[in-house]
Every structure is written in structure tokens, then in C-alpha cells.
Design a protein with these regions (language model features):
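Short, well-ordered coil/turn segments that N-cap beta-strands
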Residues: 8-12, 48-51, 86-92, 125-134, ...
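Conserved, mostly hydrophobic/aromatic
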Residues: 55, 94, 136
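Active-site capping/gating regions of soluble enzymes
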Residues: 104-181
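Active-site acidic/histidine proton-transfer and metal-coordination neighborhood
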Residues: 70-93, 101, 107-111
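Alpha/beta catalytic barrel-like cores
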Residues: 1-48, 61, 149, 153, ...
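Glycine-rich anion/phosphate-binding loops
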Residues: 27-42, 66-81, 115
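Glycine-rich, proline-tolerant flexible connector loops at the mouths of alpha/beta enzymes
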Residues: 1, 25-26, 57-70, 98-104, ...
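Hydrophobic pocket-lining residues that define ligand/cofactor binding sites across diverse proteins
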Residues: 45, 82-85, 124, 164
């Protein structure tokens, strides 16, 4: 399949995390797993034609969440993943996603998303990631799906752009979003 994709002019890639699991000592939160054996899997994926990969860290917004433990654990995993992907000659898609589940306000989403993205970049820098060789795939700034205080599309755009300008280094060449928000 990768060769067929390449023949059309598209670039094949693959999701390499193995999913979000309960975070020890914070069971309401998740940490993404899949680092064990990743270097070897990446070699195989590259040989098969993959040129980019994706890893998703998920965060919830509640009264005391996301916790520092969840923020740090997922940011560290995203950085380790990115280092291995760049080492293998591929482009990492770094996806720190603050979920829209819940009753939180757009302002809470802005604050938590900024914190999550900034911590991710702190870890990416510590791990010596070439920021010009990644794609960031964050969430948009939205009120929770159960919030009574929704914001307009214009406010979503404005708050998302403000968050990204505040949190993302200029070296990052691309930012992608889910089509559903």
C-alpha cells in the first residue's frame, strides 16, 4: 500500500502509539504508550515507505485536571517519540490534544491548552528535537461539549490563534487540525 500511495504523489505515514492507558496514581487521566520497541518498528515502517508518523497524547479538563503528572508524562512521551522518529529519518506529527469532553469554558481550554503545548515544547527542546522538522496537531480552543457557554467560530479562531502564537516556537513549519474540531 505505501508504494501505491507514493505513486499518486502522496506521502504515506503511520500512527505509532499503542493507545492511551490509565495513568498510574491518576486513574481519571491517560498516558499514551508505545515507546517499547519503537526504534525497531520505525526502521520497518521506513523500509516499507512511511515518511511521517503520528503520536497522540490526550488530556482532560476537570477541576484539578489535567494534572502536572499527566502533562509531564505525555509531554515526555511525545518528545521521546519525536526523537526516535527524527533519528529514523521521518517527520513526527506531535499531537497533544486537550479533549473537548466536559463542561469547561473556552477560557479554561485556552489556559490548559497553552500549558500543555508549552510543556510539550519544553520537552521537545530538552530532547534536542529539530522543531523545523515536526508538525504540530493540537486541539482548537473550544468550550466543553457540555458547556452552556459556547463561543462563536470567530472566537474559536481568534483564541486558537492567540494560544498558538503564545505557545508554539516560530521554527515549527506546520500546524494541522482535526476536521471535527
Amino acid at each position: 500500500i505505501p508504494s501505491i500511495i507514493s505513486e499518486t504523489g502522496a506521502v504515506p505515514g503511520i500512527k505509532v502509539d499503542t493507545g492511551a492507558k490509565d495513568l498510574a496514581n491518576s486513574p481519571d487521566e491517560k498516558v499514551t504508550e508505545g515507546l517499547d520497541g519503537l526504534r525497531e518498528r520505525l526502521k520497518k515502517y521506513y523500509e516499507l515507505g512511511a515518511r511521517f508518523t503520528k503520536w497522540r497524547g490526550v488530556y482532560i479538563i476537570r477541576e484539578k485536571y489535567p494534572s502536572k503528572l499527566a502533562i509531564n508524562s505525555n509531554a515526555h512521551a511525545l518528545a521521546r517519540y519525536s526523537a526516535l522518529v527524527q533519528e529514523s529519518g521521518m517527520v513526527p506529527i506531535v499531537e497533544p490534544e486537550v479533549l473537548m469532553d466536559g463542561e469547561h469554558s473556552a477560557e479554561d481550554c485556552f489556559i490548559k491548552t497553552s500549558e500543555v503545548i508549552q510543556k510539550c515544547f519544553d520537552e521537545l527542546i530538552i530532547h534536542k528535537i529539530d522543531l523545523s522538522g515536526i508538525i504540530l496537531k493540537p486541539n482548537m480552543i473550544l468550550a466543553g461539549n457540555k458547556s452552556k457557554n459556547k463561543i462563536s467560530n470567530e472566537e474559536v479562531s481568534s483564541k486558537t490563534l492567540q494560544c498558538l502564537k503564545k505557545s508554539v516556537p516560530n521554527e515549527v513549519p506546520g500546524i494541522a487540525f482535526l476536521s471535527g474540531g
